[in-house]
């Protein structure tokens, strides 16, 4: 099993280091860290998709924009075709049809934008996330985070309940239809009720893509949590339940310390984590 670490979308919010902890100018840099997994017998598997081709070319087309203007301005999203998962899959010598499965941490617009670029793929998601994203969206945040046109092209969904077998103290859904047991969904509610991490057995240990369960590298791997002001505020804006989010974040932090040799944890938006993963360096 081979894993490629991709950046499938870049945001450059005003605030610089107040967001990413390292920029020297007025703009920060936040990535959309996705995984492309080459399995032995089940084709290619994507974990999240970032922004898709239609997001790049028609982000605000009425009557239902794929990305709402307030969120695009707030995040200062840089939509680039070369960063879409499809174009990166093609650059690696594969075709869209080679991607047979997509496992999503959740269906926010910056994670699900590329779903329809892989129309032959089965999309695996927590049932609660699917229901919340496709049902009535009452709050302002819900209406902006879940964009109906992004998942419209999905032909095959596989939805899962929250119960499963233990995985390092977390419940985990192990039997993902059509996928090897080396790929698991790990429910991590808080950012959304149906949010989950995706755990992958690499042969050298487990890699847990934690999605938006945390946003900043120093929220893990240290006794005390540290997060930049910008990302701390954004997490609070987007959370559906602060207690669940912070509890799961604390559990992940304990896992990152106590099982450092067995489990590597990376989130969806930290550029330093992405760069280290791409370089094969420890986090």
Where is each model-derived feature located?
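Conserved beta-strand hairpin/beta-sheet module of binuclear metal-dependent hydrolase folds
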Residues: 2, 10-87, 198-211
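Core dinuclear metal-dependent hydrolase active-site scaffold
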Residues: 2-5, 19-22, 34-39, 161-203
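Active-site metal-binding loops of divalent metal-dependent hydrolases
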Residues: 49-51, 107, 129, 190-192, ...
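Cap/insert and terminal regions of metallo-dependent hydrolase folds
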Residues: 53, 66-67, 71-85, 204-283
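Active-site metal-binding motif and surrounding structural segment of the metallo-beta-lactamase
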Residues: 60-125
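Metallo-beta-lactamase
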Residues: 77-98, 127-187, 237-262
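Short hydrophobic/aromatic-enriched beta-strand-loop microsegments
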Residues: 122-127, 209-211
